[in-house]
Amino acid sequence: MNLWSPTTLKEILARHNLTLSHGLGQHFLTDFGILAKIVEKAEITKDDAVLEIGPGAGVLTRLLAQAAKYVVAIEIDKKLLPVLAETTGDLGNVVVVNADAREINFDRVMAEQTGGEFGFEGKPYLIVANLPYYATSPLIFKVFEEGYKVSSMTLMMQKEVAERITAKPGSKIYGSLSVACQYFSEPRIVLKVPRTVFFPPPEVESAVVRFTLKENSLTSEERLKFFQIVRAAFATRRKTIAKSLSGALNLKRNYVEEVLLKVGIKPDLRAEQIPPESFYRLSQEVVGGKW
């Protein structure tokens, strides 16, 4: 089944009386070379389980199924389920789950669909996805905030978001997403993708980012505090870190400055000048004492 042909895709969608939803960010990748590159960059083995978010018509899904032991595909659009049944129904290692990926527990779903082999107390799994642009940041934050048992992510996204994720301290586009991604993983842009290889073409250029997740033992409380501090710090970018934190968290300025100095952060710096590791040290000081 030549799913990477726009003509074939149009025929399948027409057969099911479907039109693509702009609101759900439905843009199907139809270039076989780029699809194969995504699978290659994901470094999938026959012992791996892959969580795919937004399989669409199953174009990438079929290639993932060739490389992995299991593929669990999460699709929000009920109208696409008959399409996926047609395009992936012959694959014995693919399960399609109709759900909003922003609202489900990834570890639980993976454990349920792999007989407990992956997720929770099982082995780590991979995430590979051509993400809907509107959900990119929420889904990435979700993985890091929840501490899911994910070893790597290979994600197609808007090029602008990819550049924010990999931006370094001091850059105008370095922000809370940069801090989260670079503290919990090692993100790299591994592929740039033109808009012309999608059906229908989006209005922006895309890029594929490969995230290699770092091992850490943060508790739920520590993760919560880390993200609370990072978001508060970037809430008012033009202010100093001391002003931002004292204002957003309703704390006395002199107390905030004292804590910042204790962990080696100058109170007159702005959030965009502070590396991820410094935010971690700050969150640890807060967890260990009073905030």
UniProtKB/Swiss-Prot annotation:
It holds the Pfam family RrnaAD. Keywords: Cytoplasm, Methyltransferase, RNA-binding, rRNA processing, S-adenosyl-L-methionine, Transferase. It catalyses: adenosine(1518)/adenosine(1519) in 16S rRNA + 4 S-adenosyl-L-methionine = N(6)-dimethyladenosine(1518)/N(6)-dimethyladenosine(1519) in 16S rRNA + 4 S-adenosyl-L-homocysteine + 4 H(+). One of its GO terms (cellular component) is cytosol. S-adenosyl-L-methionine binds at residues 27, 29, 54, 75, 100, 130. One of its GO terms (molecular function) is RNA binding. Its EC number is 2.1.1.182. InterPro entries: KsgA/Erm (IPR001737), rRNA_Ade_diMease-like_C (IPR023165), rRNA_Ade_Mease_Trfase_CS (IPR020596), rRNA_Ade_methylase_Trfase_N (IPR020598), rRNA_adenine_dimethylase (IPR011530), SAM-dependent_MTases_sf (IPR029063). It is found in: Cytoplasm. PROSITE patterns: RRNA_A_DIMETH (PS01131), SAM_RNA_A_N6_MT (PS51689). Gene3D superfamilies: Ribosomal RNA adenine dimethylase-like, domain 2, Vaccinia Virus protein VP39. NCBIfam families: ksgA (TIGR00755). Belongs to the class I-like SAM-binding methyltransferase superfamily. rRNA adenine N(6)-methyltransferase family. RsmA subfamily. Specifically dimethylates two adjacent adenosines (A1518 and A1519) in the loop of a conserved hairpin near the 3'-end of 16S rRNA in the 30S particle. May play a critical role in biogenesis of 30S subunits. This is Ribosomal RNA small subunit methyltransferase A.
